[in-house]
Amino acid sequence: MKKTTSDIGMNKTGIGTSPIDSADITKAAQERQPSHLGDDTLILKVRQQYALESGGVGSVPPPSSLKGVAKTAVDMLKGSKPTVFIDKLGERAAFERTGTRLYQGALAKFEVLGSWEGGPTREGLERILNDELSHFGLVTEALVKLGADPTAMTPCADVAAVSSMGLPAVVSDPRMNLRDTLHALLVAELTDNAGWEMLIELARGLGHDELADRFQMALDAEAQHLAMVRGWLSAGVTLEARANPVPQAEATNAPTPLV
């Protein structure tokens, strides 16, 4: 695995590395024009048809306890739709579970590659990992308290899982170094912060002020995570851009500050 990503090498993805062949291809494309000057109207109709026929990505399961059934009925009588809150809680649970695995992968690469000046520390990565796991427990507890099944895959949880599929792929790819992994973590933290903000707003709007206060503590921690990851990545990119970069620190000698 390479520790840097910006070294010059045998990258042949661009046409500039083969001017003769690329000129032939360009000439052939100009000589053989498309047989039909169509647009995307037909494919748009197909997509619309699929959208009309689709049954969606699932549904929120019914309450798993009598308490949940009663609470749902009361909330609906008040004019609110509690299943929306359950759905978004399921989304948070799925994302925090994924976040835990992302930081487990980051720690594995840290152990192999070490860190750099101003880069991640073992203590910092472990702190965030433990926070993610704690947040997963918090959301699970909230779901149980509301009488919902925390093991169910809600529609928003499904969407979150699909939309973030690329993040675990980056972290687990042996070709990706620790800086590449931090880029994936930065994307995750940006999404995570926005997700908690919306969940808190929804909780307060539905009268779950106690839960909202606890969620705010989670958001405060997530804001710290975002600052830490952004700082680590920025330090790594800046260091690599130097003409004579400082050698990468060994994992056992990684700096102790968390940020």
Feature names for model-found ranges:
Residues 2-259:
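Non-heme di-metal
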